[in-house]
């Protein structure tokens, strides 16, 4: 039975953690995750998704929430646990060389490396209109997502939002980590092709700001930034649910309401047309498209804003 230290934080990581802890070939000896965070208006201290899952279902397994992995006491603790593997999935911290040298460190990255190294591989794939994505296991080294690839699985992501792709890739990753660890000695690591590498940065709230220039680009942003940070106009109006109707139409005014439907409306962009199904003004409740227009006394051929 191989001893595993798992390092991960969000629900994507929990899916992988669950697969490992339930498999009889592995013994989870510790979880490392981000410290509890203050959440919401009341700033309630909330544990990470992985910590909540493990403490509720496997309370005897130790959980560590260090602010830094460079702490000598933490490094000694990991060394004393004597893991056969350290598995990392969306942990949120860089592993120092002192830890990388203790055991094979296997990272599960939510892209087909070397494409989309960095913090937002799923959102970046959607923004770039990729129809395929996937997940891979990688031997970690000091560089950011630069290690040799062990195995990968591919899937279709066309017209899926970030939330859906996260769930899809988490389930793939849970299968993949079992395969990689069980077959580790037989797998020949494949060095990444540096000339094909692309980088992606962390998503910020302001990335959700949109204009009505291009319907296709707005739609891809909507998919990429669901559920967070969402998409919103400069005046704070959020588009919560929308569909791409036409990506080429150009014979209407930008922002013109083209047609009212039962619970939605068609909106002209400079190029293309969107169906707006649900939207929300800042500080107000969400409304379906038709109800929102009725409340504003807006009709066909009027401008939305």
Swiss-Prot record:
Protein's name according to its UniProt entry: Methionyl-tRNA formyltransferase
EC number of this enzyme: 2.1.2.9
InterPro entries to which the protein is assigned, alphabetical: Fmt, Formyl_trans_C, Formyl_transf_N, Formyl_transf_N_sf, Formyl_transferase-like_C_sf, GART_AS, Met-tRNA-FMT_C, Met-tRNA-FMT_N
Keywords from the named record: Protein biosynthesis, Transferase
One GO CC annotation: cytosol
SUPFAM superfamilies the record matches: FMT C-terminal domain-like, Formyltransferase
Provenance organism: Campylobacter jejuni subsp. jejuni serotype O:6 (strain 81116 / NCTC 11828)
Molecular functions (GO terms): methionyl-tRNA formyltransferase activity
Keyword Protein biosynthesis attributed: yes
The protein's role, per its UniProt record: Attaches a formyl group to the free amino group of methionyl-tRNA(fMet). The formyl group appears to play a dual role in the initiator identity of N-formylmethionyl-tRNA by promoting its recognition by IF2 and preventing the misappropriation of this tRNA by the elongation apparatus.
Domain of life of the native organism: Bacteria
Membership in a protein family: Belongs to the Fmt family.
Reactions accelerated catalytically: L-methionyl-tRNA(fMet) + (6R)-10-formyltetrahydrofolate = N-formyl-L-methionyl-tRNA(fMet) + (6S)-5,6,7,8-tetrahydrofolate + H(+)
The keyword Transferase is assigned to this record: yes
Amino-acid positions noted as binding (6S)-5,6,7,8-tetrahydrofolate in the UniProt annotation, renumbered to this chain: 111-114
Family matches, as NCBIfam families: fmt
């Amino acid at each position: 039975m191989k001893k595993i230290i798992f390092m991960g934080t969000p629900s994507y990581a929990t899916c992988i953690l669950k697969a490992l802890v339930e498999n009889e070939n592995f013994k989870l000896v510790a979880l490392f995750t981000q410290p509890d965070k203050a959440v919401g208006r009341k700033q309630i201290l909330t544990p990470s998704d992985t910590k909540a899952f493990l403490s509720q279902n496997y309370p005897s397994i130790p959980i560590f929430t260090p602010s830094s992995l460079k702490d000598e006491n933490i490094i000694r603790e990991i060394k004393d646990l004597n893991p056969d593997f350290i598995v990392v999935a969306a942990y949120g911290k860089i592993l120092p060389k002192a830890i990388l040298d203790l055991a094979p460190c296997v990272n599960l990255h939510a892209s087909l490396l070397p494409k989309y190294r960095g913090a937002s591989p799923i959102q970046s794939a959607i923004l770039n209109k990729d129809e395929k994505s996937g997940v891979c296991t990688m031997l970690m080294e000091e560089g950011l997502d630069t290690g040799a690839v062990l195995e990968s699985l591919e899937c279709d992501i066309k017209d899926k939002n970030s939330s859906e792709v996260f769930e899809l890739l988490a389930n793939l990753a849970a299968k993949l980590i079992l395969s990689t660890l069980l077959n580790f000695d037989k797998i020949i690591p494949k060095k990444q092709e540096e000339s094909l590498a692309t980088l992606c940065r962390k998503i910020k709230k302001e990335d959700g700001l949109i204009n009505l220039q291009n319907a296709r680009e707005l739609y891809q942003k909507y998919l990429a930034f669901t559920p967070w940070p969402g998409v919103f106009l400069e005046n704070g109006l959020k588009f919560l649910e929308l569909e791409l109707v036409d990506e080429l139409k150009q014979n209407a005014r930008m922002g013109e309401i083209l047609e009212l439907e039962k619970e939605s409306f068609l909106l002209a962009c400079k190029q293309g047309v969107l169906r707006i199904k649900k939207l929300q003004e800042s500080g107000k409740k969400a409304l379906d498209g038709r109800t929102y227009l009725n409340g504003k006394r807006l009709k066909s051929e009027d401008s939305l804003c």
